[in-house]
Amino acid sequence: MIEDNSLGLEFKYLIVNDMDRKFGLWVNTVGYQSIPPDSPYPLKEHPSGYFFNAEKGRVLREYQLVYITKGRGLFSSDSTSEKQVCKGRLMVLFPGQWHTYRPLRQTGWTEYYIGFEGPMIDAIVDDAFLSQEQQILEIGLNEELVSLFSRALAVAEADKISAQQYLSGIVLHMIGMILSVSKNKVFEMSDVDQKIEQAKIIMNENVSGNVDPEELAMRLNISYSW
């Protein structure tokens, strides 16, 4: 587990054994990083298999879900022309597919991600529940999804017996939620609802620290009395 609160960085790369693979779905990595404006991207703390030059892109051997909760940036892949990604959007990455993404320097961004593979997810993709033709999904700000990423990080860090099976269940929960929310347009909340979700996410990210209510109100551009 690598954690650097000064950078807003936390991630875990997991060891997968033969028994984990028999389950049909396993997780290789899970993480969170907050990239301030005018910062290099990606951060160099990642292993060589994951670190990449955003100008050249990369090809992974796994699926990934990358959820943006703050800021904006750009994404492109073999099947997707360059598109803007902003808070509330989720990128789906596929194994063997070239892709690249990065935050805009003037905004930075906050991302949550989880990487996984296995025949279980292959079957889900083969049946077109997830598609390379639709790699950017509109989710909106969703505190429940952020909580699932946080739970996955906690499970990965504890690394107890059957942690991989626990993590696989979290991935399936995420996929089910993502499909439901994006297809039913549940993300189309009012501005007030979205600010409430954003406040929940900020408090979730600062669960071990103190969140000043007045400062939080200023960040959300609302009055403290509201």
Q: Residue ranges of each PLM-predicted region?
A:
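Short, leucine-enriched amphipathic alpha-helices that occur as contiguous helical runs
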Residues: 62, 192, 196-200
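Generic protein-terminus/edge-of-domain signal
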Residues: 1-83, 105
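Ligand-binding loop in jelly-roll beta-barrel domains
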Residues: 82, 96-119
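Basic/polar phosphate-binding segments, predominantly the helix-turn-helix DNA-binding elements
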Residues: 177, 198, 204, 209-226
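Amphipathic alpha-helical segments enriched in hydrophobic/aromatic residues interleaved with Lys/Arg
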Residues: 15, 123-185, 201
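Short acidic-glycine-tyrosine-enriched beta hairpin
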Residues: 79-94
